[in-house]
A protein has these predicted regions:
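Non-catalytic signal-transmission and effector/linker regions of two-component phosphorelay proteins
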Residues: 1-14, 19-30, 94-115
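A generic structural motif
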Residues: 33-41
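Acidic, metal-coordinating helix/loop segments flanking the phosphotransfer/catalytic sites
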Residues: 43-58
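Short, charged, surface-exposed secondary-structure boundary motifs
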Residues: 51-52, 72, 94-99
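Active-site residues of response regulator receiver
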Residues: 63-64
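Hydrophobic residue at a beta-alpha junction
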Residues: 68-70
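Short amphipathic alpha-helix used as the core "switch/output" element in two-component signaling
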Residues: 72-83
Length: 115
């Protein structure tokens, strides 16, 4: 098990979606249906660090636009909790197309977390 800098009781099957839009949240919810016990927590940009520290997600999902706000901080945040940082272009994308692209990455991340 990894050492942790943040107080946490157990590894979780949480995915934190930062900033939406709604289609991205829907895509993450549907992609997570293949992962037993997975649940989605959403947050806005200003409380992303708090939510990640609270839940220790195996994946952090956001749009490329949100990521562009502070790439170095998001990379560090994901690294601190050993989470996948999944970024996607949401401009013109459908929830279905984002779900299909996201599903394999989430499955790989959850398997890596619990190896």
């Amino acid at each position: 098990m990894r050492e942790r800098d943040t107080v946490e009781t157990s590894l979780s099957t949480v995915i934190v979606v930062v900033g939406g839009p709604d289609e991205l949240v829907q895509a993450a919810r549907r992609a997570a249906t293949d992962i037993p016990g997975a649940r989605i927590e959403t947050c806005d940009l200003r409380n992303a660090a708090t939510m990640v520290a609270k839940y220790w997600p195996f994946a952090i999902v956001m749009s490329e636009d949100v990521y562009a706000f502070d790439p170095q901080e998001f990379e560090a945040l994901a690294r601190d909790v050993a989470a996948l940082l999944y970024k996607t272009n949401t401009d013109g994308a459908t929830a279905h197309s984002m779900e299909e692209a996201m599903r394999p990455a989430l499955l790989e991340a959850v398997y890596a977390r619990f190896e």
